[in-house]
């Protein structure tokens, strides 16, 4: 199969995708209701899209093409409200969060769609374990070479996105010690990790053709990279975030990525090299394990600082681009999180400490989702 033609898109437009937990309202375990939700929303009018995901216990919402923080917030609220209304009719709950706190993966049912059945057959139990919930952000790129430049420039900031969005401290009734345990499920897939270091679309097409010829992949969907190009949309897709507990937090993180993209592609402050990835896996682990308190190592200078400190320094550098995009309010929220060194994982642990019940913790997640 040939690689799709890269469709040039308006630079720095963006779209947001959120995978959502579907839970019962008895003990707040995951439940099988995605098909029923899809039937109930037929005929409803809303921006963007709502689609099923790999198991019956999750559903995905996505915005249209957004230009601003204000538009993203408006669209996410509108789509969220349609889903909440349908969930109320079914007496089920919806929640953000990168993992469900106590579900058993073996109870999951694969959604009846050809691609999901194919993934289940290929990956076995990993497919059911993949009932984890992420936020993806697409960023519009003017041409394919710019997309690859942005992809590799953005990789330096992957720890920021993980730490800011982290909302998965609990897995199967256990506090994992991680801020984002969700990504441990993603790492199990053989085509996860980072994209190959190529900087021209011609070289990327050669790589893709070689991979297709091995029989390992059929399309870009088979790559579970942290950031991957999406040629049919004319975007790069940042895929490392946990789904936040609120749509407002999701919009703020998306606009942080949008503003970074404008800075990286307009100012071109980084000279890219393969050595940028020397500490990539270490930095990513630190963000997953320790959140905003994790260590971030600069691959060029060897300088070490906390991820929170690196975010605050980055916010200063990209401030002019935030003003140009109208994203100051979003970046103020990001700055507040970095200054306080708290994220949704912190909130979940606080609730559990107070309530001493993961069932009650998930119930409060459902309330947060409605805010």
UniProtKB/Swiss-Prot annotation:
It comes from the Bacteria. GO terms for biological process: modified amino acid biosynthetic process. The keyword ATP-binding applies. GO terms for molecular function: ATP binding; glutamate-cysteine ligase activity. It holds the Pfam family GCS2. Belongs to the glutamate--cysteine ligase type 2 family. YbdK subfamily. HAMAP family: Glu_cys_ligase_2. This is Putative glutamate--cysteine ligase 2. It comes from Burkholderia lata (strain ATCC 17760 / DSM 23089 / LMG 22485 / NCIMB 9086 / R18194 / 383).
